[in-house]
């Protein structure tokens, strides 16, 4: 076990300068000498701090427009030198020990995220000296502290005060892990960016570069941070943890703030994600109740209490122990209605009123989450693990509106039927395939999910409605994919379905349309499928 290592000299070179002046001032107060480069050195000097520029220390100026600053033996020897082993050679070469390296890297991700970022601009924002120093310091964590997160400044100073300006090996090891995570993420971003460009950059302009490459890199590097570990996974014998992306801007289960309740389980997170993503697709006050990642009740209302009452009415049996999501603030009256009526695992809403928080405290096991408001959805990739590989695709963010609908039946829909069709279609997108949804007046009446046969999904939707005493007559029906045969339309007509919305695209589309006309039903095609597996 290495002893605590005192910090006598620190090298500071940062792109994100948040808090760096205050941290440097605190180091100087503790007797630490400062080395620095370029803009960081100027900032520290402007604040009256005694700082030695790396170029003065090495005897070599910064050159090539800043491309070469710290790539020098006197820098890396000072970082990599093993105390007690390399002391003699360091002394012979005039190399001073560097006990702390404070570095964060050029903002590559922010640069390439700009709409008009050129390859040349991206290249100039690839940090070379920074990652090299970070890796050197992390490798020699036995003797050197590497700091890549500005949020660690205060904790480092506190520990130095506890240990006579030293940091423990445990802390240096933890900082080294963060450093390797930091450089791994940085290199992954660069590899992904170049992997997307390789063909478009080298093919002739007239060739279809997008078709040859598209947005998928040659190698896929994913970087997620562990947010929590769990007692178990989907089942009791499976270990599990939850990892999240950095810099997610939209409201999501990964960024939501938990106000109360036990830690979220694996299944809680999966179901809450399904509920939240569904409710986010509606503009009017809406409620979505989810069980086993499938909506079991969805409704709109004049307010969220009305929406909840109608969503619950679809399937009270399945709603027991479910997840409830809202797209408006959770108020006290709605919260009280929920806890009086049913057992619920998770409630998630953009915000929760103070009165509602006070009421929910009486049910301490109910997990309550605030996800914040949302204004849009970020484009992202969906990843699914298969044995030996990953399936990667664009997230299904496709939606349709009135202008996209194609009426193919003889009977034309009324204005209310069109509203119900669009509502029903939005819900079907979030139901496991094969998905059939019955709806009326912006309320789900029956949901059939996850069946191998589309006809059986329709039958289950009807059975669910019948069991809850809901009238299917006059409902609209949505199907996440086309009807391969007319039998689904015939079955729907028997229970009183008046309108059907589906993507179309079957070889037997005309046969299916003819069936709708025979039953005097409205049939609308979207041209967009929503398989969900």
Swiss-Prot record:
Coiled coil: none annotated. Pathway: Purine metabolism; IMP biosynthesis via de novo pathway; 5-formamido-1-(5-phospho-D-ribosyl)imidazole-4-carboxamide from 5-amino-1-(5-phospho-D-ribosyl)imidazole-4-carboxamide (10-formyl THF route): step 1/1; Purine metabolism; IMP biosynthesis via de novo pathway; IMP from 5-formamido-1-(5-phospho-D-ribosyl)imidazole-4-carboxamide: step 1/1. This is Bifunctional purine biosynthesis protein PurH. Residues 1-148 form the MGS-like domain. It comes from the Bacteria. GO terms for cellular component: cytosol. The IMP cyclohydrolase activity resides in the N-terminal region. GO terms for molecular function: IMP cyclohydrolase activity; phosphoribosylaminoimidazolecarboxamide formyltransferase activity. GO terms for biological process: 'de novo' IMP biosynthetic process. It comes from Pasteurella multocida (strain Pm70). It catalyses: (6R)-10-formyltetrahydrofolate + 5-amino-1-(5-phospho-beta-D-ribosyl)imidazole-4-carboxamide = 5-formamido-1-(5-phospho-D-ribosyl)imidazole-4-carboxamide + (6S)-5,6,7,8-tetrahydrofolate; IMP + H2O = 5-formamido-1-(5-phospho-D-ribosyl)imidazole-4-carboxamide. Its EC number is 2.1.2.3, 3.5.4.10. Belongs to the PurH family. InterPro entries: AICAR_Tfase_dup_dom_sf (IPR024051), Cytidine_deaminase-like (IPR016193), MGS-like_dom (IPR011607), MGS-like_dom_sf (IPR036914), PurH-like (IPR002695). Keywords: Hydrolase, Multifunctional enzyme, Purine biosynthesis, Transferase.
């Amino acid at each position: 076990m290495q002893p605590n290592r005192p910090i006598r000299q620190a090298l500071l070179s940062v792109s994100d300068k948040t808090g760096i002046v205050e941290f440097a001032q605190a180091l100087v107060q503790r007797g630490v000498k400062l080395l620095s480069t370029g803009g960081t050195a100027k900032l520290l000097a402007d604040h009256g701090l005694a700082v030695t520029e790396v170029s003065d220390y090495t005897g070599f100026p910064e050159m090539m427009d800043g491309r070469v600053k710290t790539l020098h033996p006197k820098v890396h020897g000072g970082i990599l030198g093993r105390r007690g082993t390399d002391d003699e050679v360091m002394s012979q070469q005039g190399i001073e020990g560097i006990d702390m390296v404070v570095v964060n890297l050029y903002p590559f991700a922010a640069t390439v995220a700009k709409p008009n970022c050129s390859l040349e601009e991206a290249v100039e924002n690839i940090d070379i000296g920074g990652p090299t120093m970070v890796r050197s310091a992390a490798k020699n964590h036995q003797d050197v502290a590497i700091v890549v997160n500005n949020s660690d400044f205060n904790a480092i100073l506190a520990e130095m005060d506890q240990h006579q300006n030293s940091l423990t090996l445990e802390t240096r090891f933890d900082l080294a892990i963060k450093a390797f995570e930091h450089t791994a993420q940085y290199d992954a971003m660069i590899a992904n960016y170049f992997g997307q460009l390789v063909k478009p950059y080298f093919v002739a302009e007239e060739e279809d570069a997008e078709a040859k490459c598209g947005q998928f890199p040659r190698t896929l590097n994913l970087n997620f941070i562990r947010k929590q570990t769990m007692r178990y996974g989907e089942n009791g014998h499976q270990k599990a943890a939850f990892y999240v992306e950095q810099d997610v801007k939209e409201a999501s289960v990964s960024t939501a703030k938990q106000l109360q309740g036990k830690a979220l389980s694996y299944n809680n997170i999966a179901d809450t994600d399904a509920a939240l993503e569904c409710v986010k697709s509606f503009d009017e006050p809406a409620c979505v109740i989810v069980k086993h990642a499938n909506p079991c009740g969805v409704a709109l209302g004049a307010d969220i209490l009305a929406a909840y009452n109608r969503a619950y009415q679809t399937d009270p049996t399945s709603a027991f122990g479910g997840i409830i999501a809202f797209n408006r603030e959770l108020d006290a009256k709605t919260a009280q209605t929920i806890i009086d009526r049913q057992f619920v695992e998770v409630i998630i809403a953009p915000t929760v009123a103070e009165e509602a928080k006070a009421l929910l405290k009486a049910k301490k096991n109910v997990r309550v989450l605030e996800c914040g408001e949302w204004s849009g959805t970020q484009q992202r990739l969906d990843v699914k693990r298969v044995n030996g590989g990953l399936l990667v695709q664009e997230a299904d963010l496709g939606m349709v509106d009135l202008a996209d609908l194609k009426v193919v039946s003889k009977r034309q829909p009324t204005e209310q039927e069109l509203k119900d069709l669009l509502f029903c279609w939005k819900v079907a997108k979030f139901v496991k395939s094969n998905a059939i949804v019955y709806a009326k007046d912006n309320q789900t009446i029956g949901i059939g999910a996850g069946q191998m046969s589309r006809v059986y999904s329709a039958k289950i939707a009807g059975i669910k409605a019948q069991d809850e005493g809901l009238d299917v007559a006059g409902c609209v029906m949505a199907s996440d994919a086309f009807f391969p045969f007319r039998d689904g339309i015939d079955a729907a007509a028997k229970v009183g379905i008046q309108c059907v919305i589906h993507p179309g695209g079957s070889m037997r589309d005309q046969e299916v349309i003819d069936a709708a006309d025979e039953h005097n039903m409205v049939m609308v095609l979207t041209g967009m499928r929503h398989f969900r597996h």
